[in-house]
Amino acid sequence: MNQENTQIVAAFYKFVSLPDFTEKQVPLLAYCLAQDIKGTILLAKEGINGTIAGSRLSIDNVLSYLRADLRLQDLEHKESTADTPPFERMKVRLKKEIVTLGLPEVDPNEQVGTYVTPEEWNELISDPEVIVIDTRNDYEVHIGTFQGAQNPQTNSFRDFPEYVRQNLDPNQHKKVAMFCTGGIRCEKASSFMLSQGFAEVYHLKGGILKYLEQIPPEESLWQGECFVFDERIAVVHGLEPGTHELCFCCGHPLAEEDKASPQYEEGISCSHCFDSLTEDKRTRQQEKWRQYQLKNSHSLGNSKL
């Protein structure tokens, strides 16, 4: 990795009452742009959630700027690195929720599950009385998860409450352990489950990313790679970039064995979207792929000037 061009990727969130969140949008965006930072930050009445990338100095400056607000002074973040900028632009968006469960009455500022550190996680999920639930979407679970974890097979986090209502019983499932990418979805999910009468609800502090950062591979109960929402696609232990790519057509993460499928055609289809492609859709996708390659070839040529 070229140290001079290394991008620091910082992910952070905090559930905290921000009644003035709309007033923070413009000055925060201006400061990030001045620091040559790219990424996305979400602001809502319930808190802040963001992933940004830039130089070491710029990231430190933005985090200091955020923490200057006393409500965010203990804002925690996780870091990883990227060889190239993982984001194309900087956005600061106003939202109803910083992670969308679709139930505004669920408030992690009022109640939340018990945090479990990465060092304590293996022992917890090895307990046969504990049901372990991956709160992420099905396409994320597809490329990696913890041993023995349940996959709710959701397409959206909004689907999670219905999964709980249909499949879990507070009287039967006494101990529940949950995890997600960085921890934010589990804050909402654990708050929801407590409201449904589940007594012992645990979640992985810092999420999968903190676990992969702190737990060595030889001690790990993680299997596969962890999907991330930027151009790295996936990361492994030590938060090093993984090997997965995205299908250009449907966006599903693909391993090398997925690309060996007869239904895979670069830029056109994979086994997850092949059956949904009509001849008309295939023709449009071929043109879309051609335009993408043309654009990239022009960009590459300009970079050599």
From Swiss-Prot:
It comes from the Bacteria. Its EC number is 1.14.-.-. Keywords: Oxidoreductase, tRNA processing. The active site is at C180. PROSITE patterns: RHODANESE_3. SMART domains: RHOD. The keyword Glycosyltransferase does not apply. One of its GO terms (biological process) is tRNA modification. Transmembrane segments: none annotated. GO terms for molecular function: oxidoreductase activity, acting on paired donors, with incorporation or reduction of molecular oxygen. Pfam families: Rhodanese, UPF0176_N. The keyword Cell wall biogenesis/degradation does not apply. Residues 126-220 form the Rhodanese domain. InterPro entries: Rhodanese-like_dom, Rhodanese-like_dom_sf, TrhO, TRHO_N. It catalyses: uridine(34) in tRNA + AH2 + O2 = 5-hydroxyuridine(34) in tRNA + A + H2O. Belongs to the TrhO family. Catalyzes oxygen-dependent 5-hydroxyuridine (ho5U) modification at position 34 in tRNAs. HAMAP family: TrhO. This is tRNA uridine(34) hydroxylase. It comes from Trichormus variabilis (strain ATCC 29413 / PCC 7937). The lineage of its organism: Bacteria, Bacillati, Cyanobacteriota, Cyanophyceae, Nostocales.
